[in-house]
Structure formats: structure tokens, C-alpha cells
Design a protein with these regions (language model features):
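Extracellular beta-strand solenoids
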Residues: 2-3, 9, 15, 21, ...
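Acidic (E/D-rich), amphipathic helical modules within compact regulatory domains
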Residues: 37-38
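Long terminal segments
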Residues: 76-176
């Protein structure tokens, strides 16, 4: 699909289709994409509540989410965000194909490619509902180091399920 001009969508988007927007994309809800071969090209900014992208992204502006941004980048399908990513929390899985963003502004940012970033993983554990990113509770330092050896697809699936429940974040941060 190609949309000329700004596009505003009331409610959530779940898609495995290609999308080209020649302007800004504003979704008054959540965005969930799940196709390795169908990219989203947005020639402007993207705004939504939560964003989980398994599709390659090319965004010439910024991503603005009041909640979570989860970008999964596979093989030869990298994602590029020319502007910044502004969200409460950011998960990026770019083990093979890079996700390039100009800057980030969030309470935490976790890159799955950095297995030693336990500080940001701990921040995520404190404010994200456990079901949203992991299917069990993580109680010790060794488990933190193992978190991204799990299936990222399953992790993204759990995030999508929590998006439907609108419960990505804990009511209040857990104690350290």
C-alpha cells in the first residue's frame, strides 16, 4: 500500500503487508508488524502508543511512542530510523542486521546484541511487566546474562500479547 500525505489511524494496526507513507504516520493505538520481507517505509515521523516491528523499517523522521518500541532486525533486512527513537523503553534485536537510529531518549534501551548490558536489562525488569518480555521471572545475575539467548520471536510475541492487554508496564517500578 502507498499512502500520499499524512496518515492517521484510529486504533491498533497489526500487519504483515508492505506499507509506504509519503508523510507522517500517527496510530492512536499500537503498531505490530510481522513480516521479514515486507518493509515499512515512512517518509516522516511515526507516532503510536507501543510499536513492535518484525518488518524492516525505513523511517526518515523519528519514532515517538508513549510506551515501548521493540525492533527485531533479521539477516539482510536492517532497519534505519533517520531521526531519534523517543519511547519509555526500547528493545532492539540486531544480532545479524543492524538497526541504525540517530539517537534515543528513553528510561532504558536494551540491544540484544550486547549480552553484557545487565544495567539496562535491570532497568527494564523494574518497570516492564514480566510477561511482556520474558515468560518467567528472572531472579539472579546469571539469568540476566542469558535473557537474550532465548527466542526473540517468542519475546516479541509476548510483547504483542501484553499490548493487547494494555499492560506492558508495571503499575509501579519494582524494588531493586
Amino acid at each position: 500500500k502507498v499512502h500520499r500525505g499524512d496518515l492517521v489511524v484510529e486504533g491498533n494496526i497489526e500487519s504483515n503487508q508492505k506499507l509506504i507513507v509519503l508523510g507522517n504516520l500517527t496510530v492512536k493505538g499500537n503498531i505490530s508488524t510481522f513480516s521479514l520481507s515486507n518493509p515499512w517505509v515512512i517518509l516522516g515521523n511515526v507516532t503510536a502508543t507501543n510499536i513492535v516491528a518484525d518488518s524492516p523499517l525505513l523511517i526518515t523522521g523519528s519514532i515517538n511512542a508513549s510506551g515501548l518500541v521493540f525492533i527485531d532486525s533479521y539477516y539482510d533486512n536492517p532497519s534505519t530510523i533517520k531521526g531519534s527513537i523517543n519511547a519509555r523503553g526500547i528493545f532492539i534485536n540486531d544480532i545479524i542486521a543492524p538497526v541504525v537510529a540517530s539517537s534515543t531518549n528513553s528510561e532504558f534501551m536494551v540491544r540484544a546484541s550486547d549480552k553484557h548490558d545487565t544495567e539496562n536489562v535491570k532497568k527494564a525488569l523494574m518497570i516492564i511487566n514480566p510477561d511482556a518480555y520474558y515468560w518467567g521471572l528472572i531472579n539472579d545475575e546469571d539469568a540476566l546474562k542469558e535473557i537474550f539467548k532465548r527466542s526473540n520471536i517468542r519475546m516479541a510475541g509476548n510483547v504483542c500479547n501484553q499490548m493487547k492487554k494494555e499492560a506492558l508496564f508495571r503499575p509501579k517500578p519494582s524494588p531493586e
